[in-house]
Amino acid sequence: EEYLSRVNRILTAAEQHHVQVIWMGIPYMKQAKLNKQMRYLDKLLADEISPKALWIPTDKLLSNGSDTYADSVNINGKIIRYRSKDGIHFSAEGQKLLADKIMEKIVFQTTPEMNGEERTEQLSAR
């Protein structure tokens, strides 16, 4: 409950400042006990955040679509490691995948300037 209260404070502050929030879910974890805890937390967060912000689930994204932890995926016959050996953190390739998923959701809009030039200024989430 305290954790969700903190999450809501962040979302409220963002709303007050007219800032859109993109929140990424929690991926599967290698260690079973930690994974069980994180699945519970991920569900709580998704239920709380989805109506108020853009929620990007990461569990299946980082596990090649399966319902279990995977540190690597096979892409066109090439093994790509997305997770570090600790089963928690991300490799550089995993970080890039997550960044790409965030960028897919951002819409860059141009606004006209007084001198006729356009400037990219506003961001909005899809």
Task: Describe the residue ranges of each PLM region.
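Alpha-helical cap/lid subdomain in secreted, periplasmic
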Residues: E1-T111
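Compositionally biased, proline/threonine/alanine/serine-rich low-complexity intrinsically disordered stretches
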Residues: T110-R126
